[in-house]
Amino acid sequence: MDSHRSLMEEFEGFPKKVLIGNFSQDVIIDRCKGLTRFLNFVHKEGVLSRTAIFSKFLYHSEVKATNDYLLQSQFDEACPILENTYVLLDSLQRDTGLILRTLCQLVVCLYAVGRYESAHAYAAVTLAKFHHSPTNRKIGRDLYLPLLVFCDNLWGVLGKDRRVIRARLEAARKPTRRSDDLTPNLLDKLRDDIALRTLH
């Protein structure tokens, strides 16, 4: 509510009501369409989407919830929230670091609940984001090597060809000279990051 009030004060014309309650399917569909139009407007204008207040209003509580779920190994609960958060962040082209962390969290959660094919699909998306952008590799450099080790294992579980993953692993290890034994587990790395962010 405080975030909504702040947005109303800062941006003239921001919707004045937060509606909660039990609604019919038609009402929910209409509201979803309205939200889609609103997000398209936000994306087009640009200014609003870059404010901390808007970020808090839109996805701060979801990020906090999934962080808590990850720390408590409640992977089933985290999966749908992470999927929705990723779609939202990606559609807004917002906070690349958060998108990469969200995808990595989603991949490990899907794997933990045995949804290996879904984990593979999102892992492929995550790898593509790293490989197509030097900026992303720089932003997510602490996650990249643990992600590759994770993917090597996941590809093996699914019987996928691991040659490309292993070539990327070899290339990524050269500057660090790390073996698998010295590379942090992706889940442990994500949990450490959450703990560090909580301290600041």
Regions found by a protein language model. Give the residues of each.
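Intrinsically disordered, low-complexity regulatory regions
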Residues: 2-200
